[in-house]
């Protein structure tokens, strides 16, 4: 057995008693190093107390017991203060070796340099050079010492050297600061470092390593072998180094001096008393490192009720020298085992180091397979990058096209060509005041005075046909056209806006805001703005096929004068009835209304670059018209609700709605319904505020009196007579312009009532056999059973029946039971009628 193993097996000499041993010390004066207890949890290894290698006698000659450290030994003094450590030569050298490993040895060198400078003679010429050298070496540059000094201290030293005011105490403040830093950090770490502990274990006897710098070669002489990597082979070099003559031998004096240290080491590294709080070698992290209670092994051995040699403890005296017939019963053995478990506590299982294994991703593969996988991943990445670049290029191209389009339209809107902008209905000064506010004020005055005309505007007088950009130059020119006595309508080419009746494309609608807000700056009077708002409420689209008339306006300077034989037509006074235009092409119908003055070939043409797109829009509008013919009821309801929508919707919504109708004219005389509600492919508009609509409708209905309703009926009869007379004569002037406001109020009222009914849902139900039903108005288009249950004030288990139309019975209706909360409730005659019955 090697000596390295014998170290751990030798008993503590201080624990044995010999007759020739000296008398033990007086209680309380044994020394600073108490005997170490090998019990778990009481061993403090952070600051092990040093052991003296020189057991000396006291002054009285009695002396200390051998194996005990002297209170004033060097190792003991080192732990008292930093001055004691640096005052000892071995301690200073050991501390310097530690600082070299920590790469902060400059702090100790600076401390000794300050001590040496304090002892120098100030009259000597070398003193100034030494001061400058200390300043340049440790303070001027960005070294460890300079970082730990205060700025004021460095400034004081620099000024003293520059002024050559050298004093023996000029470095005292800097030395004090560095000493304080070392006491707080380096000194505390040194007392728990391996260098100091190895020196303590060696007892400080062998000083050969001090000269050879062999502090790092001192290792623990007992315990587990060092961890060996998988790819390395262990050699006995370390063990031979430990047994070399430079290492502490196993003399009796050394064993007595290091008895307490070895007992502490045995307690720390022992098998039975392992400390669970000690950190594990990082190499063994996650390698099992667990404890197993002593009961687990003992109980597992007895689980099979087999009493074998393996299940009996051979380490204690429970079975040694005891005959088999005196061993006792099985219960006694179990009781003895449980008593042993309580006495011994937990058994720490030794951890078995696991070898290093490469992660799964780093397993070596064949070069060909690796290359194939790498190529596939790179190709996939390349495709993703190319698709991203192509998408970015397309988006950039779309942005450039839109910007180019916008710039071209801006240039075309500013030139002097007589091309009418499709949004010429909007007032040029509408941006100065909110159009919705103007419209509400005007409608309130019209409804208060139904028999009066709008200020300065005729019954069916649309705004000027001339482009707004000519108003900037000719706003002072106004023409008052008189009603001619007879004749026909002017040709199509005579009205530029009639030629622009065609279609609204994406390019034209996209430029609405820019054109009118930024290119029409001539303000208009409030009366003119109100007149134009009135026309928008009546849905008079200039350029329509049913209406064409002149009024007091700012005319285009280049517009042709009306012919002497030309005559104006009213809203119901077209050259042909509306039914005559059905089934014919727009060009033919227009030529028929013009009385043969213009043909289909003479119809205005769109620019070539927008022809295909405009044709698509026209086909879509024709398709919408055909669908509206097959649904007369829906078309009629939409036509009735349109005036109220025009009055309450936002200005931008009215503009888009008015232009998309194209050449349809007034909403009451249009066979084609509104395209937004007929074509599901169209994007839905922003819904108006229902509460605002209801409040406005109620206010207007309250202002209308019964005599006004009678006059509305008279006006409608008169209008019908005028319409029939106009269909026979071909053209006629207005029968009675004073009836214009009354004629306009009747459809507005009907549309308001219809919109009020369409926006609310009537729910009527009988609750648990009560005779009187409950009626509730909900602002919704449909209702599910779950929402219906939320409206009930009484909660419980009920059955729900709702009336629906059915051909199964003669009555034509049935009550259907609905139990799914997501099911939409059926409607009967435009409302929901249900019964709620309690489940017994």
UniProtKB/Swiss-Prot annotation:
One of its GO terms (molecular function) is protein kinase binding. Its main location: cytoplasm. Expressed in Tcf7-positive innate-like T-cells (at protein level). Residues 468-478 have a biased composition (Basic residues). GO terms for cellular component: beta-catenin destruction complex; centrosome; cytoplasm; nucleus. SUPFAM superfamilies: Regulator of G-protein signaling, RGS, Ubiquitin-like. Residues 1-75, 300-363, 398-435, 447-485, 572-614, 715-745 are annotated as: Disordered. Residues 303-318 have a biased composition (Low complexity). Interacts with glycogen synthase kinase-3 beta (GSK3B) and beta-catenin. The interaction between axin and beta-catenin occurs via the armadillo repeats contained in beta-catenin. Interacts with SMAD7 and RNF111. Interacts with ANKRD6. Interacts with SIAH1. Interacts with SIAH2. This is Axin-2.
């Amino acid at each position: 057995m090697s000596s390295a193993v014998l170290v751990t097996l030798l008993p503590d000499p201080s624990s044995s008693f010999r007759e020739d041993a000296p008398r033990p010390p007086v209680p309380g004066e044994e020394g600073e190093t108490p005997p170490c207890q090998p019990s778990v949890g009481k061993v403090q290894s952070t600051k092990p107390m040093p052991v003296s290698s020189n057991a000396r006698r006291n002054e009285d000659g009695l002396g200390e017991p051998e194996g005990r450290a002297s209170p004033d030994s060097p190792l003991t003094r080192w732990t008292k203060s930093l001055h004691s450590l640096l005052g000892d030569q071995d301690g200073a050298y050991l501390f310097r070796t530690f600082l070299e490993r920590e790469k902060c040895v400059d702090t100790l060198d600076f401390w000794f340099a300050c001590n040496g400078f304090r002892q120098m003679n100030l009259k000597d010429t070398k003193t100034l050079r030494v001061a400058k050298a200390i300043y340049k070496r440790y303070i001027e540059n960005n070294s460890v010492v300079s970082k730990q000094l205060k700025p004021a201290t460095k400034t004081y030293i620099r000024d003293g050297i520059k002024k050559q005011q050298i004093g023996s105490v000029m470095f005292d403040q800097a030395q004090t600061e560095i000493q304080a830093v070392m006491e707080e950090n380096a000194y505390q770490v040194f007392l728990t470092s391996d260098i100091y502990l190895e020196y303590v274990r060696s007892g400080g006897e062998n000083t050969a390593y001090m000269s050879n710098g062999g502090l790092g070669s001192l290792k623990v002489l007992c315990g587990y072998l060092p961890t060996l990597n998988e790819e390395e082979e262990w050699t006995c070099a370390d063990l031979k180094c430990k047994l070399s003559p430079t290492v502490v031998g196993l003399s009796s004096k050394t064993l007595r001096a290091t008895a307490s240290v070895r007992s502490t080491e045995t307690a720390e590294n022992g098998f039975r008393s392992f400390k669970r709080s000690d950190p594990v070698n990082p190499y063994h992290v996650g390698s099992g490192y667990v404890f197993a209670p002593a009961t687990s092994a003992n109980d597992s051995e007895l689980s099979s009720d087999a009493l074998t040699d393996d299940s009996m403890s051979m380490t204690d005296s429970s079975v040694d020298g005891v005959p088999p017939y005196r061993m006792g019963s099985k219960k006694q053995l179990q009781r003895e085992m449980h008593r042993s478990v309580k006495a011994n506590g937990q058994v720490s299982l030794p951890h078995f180091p696991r070898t290093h294994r490469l992660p799964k991703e780093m397993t070596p593969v064949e070069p060909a397979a690796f290359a194939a996988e790498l190529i596939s991943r790179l190709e996939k990445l390349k495709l993703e990058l190319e698709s991203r670049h192509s998408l970015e290029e397309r988006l950039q191209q779309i942005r450039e096209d839109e910007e180019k389009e916008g710039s071209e339209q801006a240039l075309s809107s500013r030139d002097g060509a007589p091309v009418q902008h499709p949004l010429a209905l909007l007032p040029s000064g509408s941006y100065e005041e909110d159009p919705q506010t103007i419209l509400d004020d005007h409608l309130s005055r019209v409804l208060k005075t139904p028999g009066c005309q709008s200020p300065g505007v005729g019954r069916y007088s649309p705004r000027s046909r001339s482009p707004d950009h000519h108003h900037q130059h000719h706003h002072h020119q106004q023409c008052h056209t008189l009603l001619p006595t007879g004749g026909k309508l002017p040709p199509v080419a005579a009205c530029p806006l009639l030629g622009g009746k065609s279609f609204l494309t994406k390019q034209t609608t996209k430029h609405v805001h820019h054109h009118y807000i930024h290119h029409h700056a001539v303000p208009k009077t409030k009366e003119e703005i109100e007149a134009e708002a009135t026309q928008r409420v009546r849905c008079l689209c200039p350029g329509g096929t049913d209406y064409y008339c002149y009024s007091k306006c700012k005319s285009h300077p280049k517009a042709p004068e009306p012919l002497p034989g030309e005559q104006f037509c009213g809203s119901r006074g077209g050259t042909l009835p509306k039914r005559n235009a059905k089934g014919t092409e727009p060009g033919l119908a227009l030529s028929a209304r013009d009385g043969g003055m213009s043909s289909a070939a003479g119809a205005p043409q769109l620019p070539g670059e927008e022809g295909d797109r405009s044709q698509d829009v026209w086909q879509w509008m024709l398709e919408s018209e055909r669908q509206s013919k097959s649904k007369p009821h829906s078309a009629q309801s939409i036509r009735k609700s349109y005036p109220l929508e025009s009055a309450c919707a936002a200005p931008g919504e009215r503009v888009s709605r008015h232009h998309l109708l194209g050449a349809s004219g007034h909403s009451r005389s249009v066979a084609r319904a509104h395209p937004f509600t007929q074509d599901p492919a169209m994007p839905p508009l922003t819904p108006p505020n229902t509460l605002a609509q209801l409040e406005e409708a109620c206010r207007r209905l309250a202002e209308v009196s019964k005599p006004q309703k009678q006059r509305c009926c008279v006006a409608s009869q008169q209008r019908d007579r005028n319409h029939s007379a106009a269909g026979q004569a071909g053209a006629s002037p207005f029968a009675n312009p004073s009836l214009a406001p009354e004629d306009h109020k009747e459809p507005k009222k009907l549309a308001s009532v219809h919109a009020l009914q369409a926006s609310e849902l009537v729910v009527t139900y009988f609750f648990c056999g009560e005779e009187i039903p409950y009626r509730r108005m909900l602002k919704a288009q449909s209702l599910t059973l779950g929402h219906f249950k939320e409206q009930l004030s009484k909660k419980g288990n009920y059955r729900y029946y709702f009336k629906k139309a059915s051909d199964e019975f003669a009555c034509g209706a049935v009550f259907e039971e609905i139990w799914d909360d997501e099911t939409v409730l059926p409607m009967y005659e435009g409302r929901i009628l249900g019964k709620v019955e309690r489940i017994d």
